[in-house]
Amino acid sequence: MSRINKFVLTVSLLIFIMISAVACGIYTQMVKERVYSLKQSVIDTAFAVANIAEYRRSVAIDLINTLNPTEEQLLVGLRTAYADSVSPSYLYDVGPYLISSDECIQVKEFEKNYCADIMQVVKYRHVKNTGFISFDGKTFVYYLYPVTHNRSLIFLLGLERFSLLSKSLAMDSENLMFSLFKNGKPVTGDEYNAKNAIFTVSEAMEHFAYLPTGLYVFAYKKDVYLRVCTLIIFFAALVAVISGASCLYLVRRVINRGIVEKEAIINNHFERVLDGGLFFSAADVKKLYSMYNSAFLDDLTKAMGRKSFDEDLKALPEKGGYLCLFDVDKFKNINDTFGHLLGDEVLMKVVKILKSQIPVDKGKVYRFGGDEFAVIYTGGTLEELLSILKEIVHFQVGSINLSTSIGVAHSNECTTVERLKMLADERLYKSKKNGRAQISWQ
């Protein structure tokens, strides 16, 4: 695995871990808050029920203080008051009842009478208290409030309704669990199993006088929590994969662009990046181009220099091609007769002619110094090369006729580059010996 792939994999893994941890952490905190909100809903529900029960008691007390009624008159007054102010159906299932030490009277006339059951269960009939009472296979929370020294009102609320009302006030109620235990046995609420619950909170609630005594258990459904966390992890993995693939694509594009720019500069194709690139600005490219020219090009003729020649000559046996060595005939006499300025013009003219004839991908022109030149030709036949070289055998600069002597050798003729260079030099000498202004290749 390459360093790039390892880097991208590490980044993707970090993205996955970060998203999973943060998202699951936020979701976990939300679930815990919902469990605590359910606990608060139970407290608020009980408080609301107690307040309404207290209000009903105050109605009875107002009747007593205002009219000082008999028991029959009190009962009629209560029934009239409750007829004018119907109790909320979502709160009360049964009652209220007016009880004393030895008597229980049903306030509402058209309900089933549970007085006998109430008198058997409720022991403290003249002290404000709450508790549980069961009859007809149902369990109720009762709220008992004294209205006189020997009479009290008792209100009943079905535990199932109490549980539903409490959960309806909490968010995400369908996934919350609420159970009430009395003496270790479940009284109401959801069927609680520790294996199926998570973030369980339990409290006796003894410090709330308006709540029936018991163990209140609140929790969240474990399967729902795990399912949501699994979805979060899957989403995090998907984001990590997409991010990793995108990162890998971009990194590879950047690297490939860098390779293109590097090869363009190394191979002297500065025109491809002359306007700047991803890694090199236009100013950088121009500076590199200038440095390249100084190191590899002849300042006067812009032919390749000795360093480039040595490198390309080493590669010639593998590529296969021709080495040509040549110089300008009687160049010293030209300098002495017409001066160095004309001599420079002659040298530049020779290089210009060859560059115009040799395709860039087939060969290069080199200058060693003075009037000594070379051509390495790797892209064509001997006939094509001779056709090109004939352009400089005879040429003119102004009105002056000039010529060159050339020696040509093929890489297949020698086993080493040193011997190849010697063979081309021998054929150059042969051209000079035979009268100059000619090409020798045999």
From Swiss-Prot:
It is a lipid-anchor. It is found in: Cell membrane. InterPro entries: Diguanylate_Cyclase, GAPES2, GGDEF_dom, Nucleotide_cyclase, Rev_trsase/Diguanyl_cyclase. The keyword Nucleotide-binding applies. It catalyses: 2 GTP = 3',3'-c-di-GMP + 2 diphosphate. The keyword RNA-binding does not apply. A lipid is attached at C24 (N-palmitoyl cysteine). Binds 1 Mg(2+) ion per monomer. NCBIfam families: GGDEF (TIGR00254). Catalyzes the synthesis of cyclic-di-GMP (c-di-GMP) via the condensation of 2 GTP molecules. This is Probable diguanylate cyclase DgcI. It comes from Escherichia coli O157:H7.
